[in-house]
Amino acid sequence: MFLIALDNMMELLPDTKEKWQPIREQIAENSRKHLWDEENQKFIPHIYLEDSPFPDDFNENKIYYHGGTAMAIKAGLLSKEEIKVSLEKMVENVKAAGAASIGLTLYPPYPKGFFENESMVPYGYQNGGDWTWFGGRMIHALIQYGFVEEAYEQIQPMVKRVKENDGFYEWYT
């Protein structure tokens, strides 16, 4: 989101571009260098300065962050081919989760008991819940990069849900 904020600032205040454009480029480059998993075509969930807080037998890199990926796309961090692969993975995750839309926060969810907050159960709230406005960010990103038909297809379950519920709700499980 910082990259998007820098882009917005430089657009609003063109005189700042000389100072901030190189910083933006360095952050984008380092984001790709340290967080992009080329082999799995996804972002690494976290890099810990010390040990992971999770058990040694838990592979956190198997978790796919839908919302973070959408924001990375909006920030211009992914190529069109990577966006296509990302969308395919999101659709695959929706099917695997039995969810309605690409608004999933992440998939698969963290196992029960991994968080101090007891409400962070699998498929609850930010641990695999389906958030229409998260999905909306991906819809916007798809349109931004020319995937208009795909955006139209993926927004349909969101619109259907809003119509069926006679309103827009924060999240679904």
Question: What are these regions, as identified by a protein language model?
Answer:
Residues 1-114, 156, 160-173:
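Catalytic cores of carbohydrate-active enzymes
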Residues 114-151:
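C-terminal substrate/ligand-recognition segments
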